[in-house]
Structures are given as C-alpha cells and as structure tokens.
Amino acid sequence: MRILGSKARLVFSLPGNYKASSPSFLSELIGTLFAAVFPTDCLLCGRELTGPGGASICHACWESMQPWLGLSCERCGLPFASSQASDAIDSLCGSCRLDEPEFDVARSYGLYTGNLRKAILQLKFHGREFLANRLGEFLAQAFKALSEPDSAIVAPVPLHASRRRQRGFNQAELLARGLVRWLRRKERFEGLQFVADLLRRTRATLPQVGLSVSARRQNVSGVFSVARPERVRNRTIVLVDDVMTTGATLSACAAALKRAGASRVLALSLARASPQFPDSGTG
C-alpha cells in the first residue's frame, strides 16, 4: 500500500500469492485502512495514543497549545516581548502608529509556534481537515475576548479558485465553520451568521511567505471584492484566517468590506507569527 498526496489516496498492490477474497488479505486490508484513518500514534509528538478511538493528537499536545496571555498591540494584537512593551505608545505597536490597518481590531489565539504551528501545518498541508473543529474551539476563546455581539457575520479569508482546487479546501473556511459551530452549540450565539462566500479573491497572487512587509501589501492590494455588498452594509464582520503575520491580507480584506459598507471589521486568526518571537516562524 502507498499513501499518495495530502488527501491520503490509498493505492494497493496485491502480492502474487494473495487472493482478494482470502480472509488473511481482508483482515490486513481492514487493518491498514483503519491505521490510515485512525492513526495509533500522535500526529505531533509520535507517542502512542491512549485516548478514544479516532483520536489523532494526544492530550498532552492539545494541552500544550496555550493562548497568548501577555501584552499585545491594542489594534493589531501583535504580541509584545517584555522589553518591547515599555516602548509602546498608547498600547500600539510601531507599525500601527505609522500605518493604521483597515480592520478595527485583530486578535489571535496564540503564537505560531510549537504544537499549535504543527497542528495548523497538519490541517493546511496534510489534509487533516478534521482538526478544524477542535482548533475552532481555540478561535472561540479569542472571539469571546472581543466582547462582540452575537449578530456578527463570520467569513473566511478566501483562496483563489485555482489554489482551492489544488488544495481541495480552504483552511480558513474550515476554521470559521468550526468557530461558529462551537459558539452556537456551547455559547448559545444563535444570531451568529456564517457566510463562506462573502469575499472573493479576484486574481491569483504569490504566496505571502518570504515577502517583505511592503511586498505583502502590494501583493494583495485590490485583490478582494464583496460579491453582494447589501449583505455587509452596516454590519459587523469577523474575518477568519489561520495565521496572521503582518496583517496585510486581513487588512486588504477589511478594505474591501469597508468600501462595501461594513460598519466594523474584526480580524481573527488562530495563530500570530511575530519577529519578536523567532520560534513563531512566518505565516
């Protein structure tokens, strides 16, 4: 058996002495399929799983994904290192003082580091779409910190159609669905509205990873549009993405929403990559 691609397509090669109808082959086939769908080792640390059937990440790894509780920029949510906090003016980072983002406020659950980063990579590049439900719970914690009304519209940062076809899904959409599902079920946010196609990306762009701050802004400038402006007029919009680095993509989305008449745009991400914390990498 070979597992091909992030969608885990299974290709079986039968040995010459095996018959597909033999009990031994069927037993091995079932076992192989079960191991592929329900791994026996944690996806992140490799330790043997001892939880209920179908678990994929061990309890210790989930527990290690803690929220950021330190000081951060009041506008964009950039985490401050202890030496940096005293230099902040009016609780704003240098970037927000020089060039205010288009969104009203941005918050992230945690730093893009450690097991949170690994879980996002498993979701994004290895087809572990089922992780979005649990990660949506983490997003819900960040959402509740915003103290927003439950009548907001939740929308994902869109992928271009070609990128979505290549990947098979939009990870931001999966996370946004997980967030709304959790808030409705556990927090009784019945008025929260999820709209998957609120925004569209009008052209393909280069990946943001590796680009400078100015190049990131230029790369996504004018890329997003609102399909039906009447849906956002005078509404509060919560934008969801997996990782926020400079905020260029979320700011470009917010600009399109504000042009369409949105009264308030909040940016919510699962993790924040920050140069002040080298281990957090880039999104």
Q: What positions do the PLM features span?
A:
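Glycine-rich phosphate/pyrophosphate-handling loop used in enzymes and phosphotransfer proteins
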Residues: M1-G283
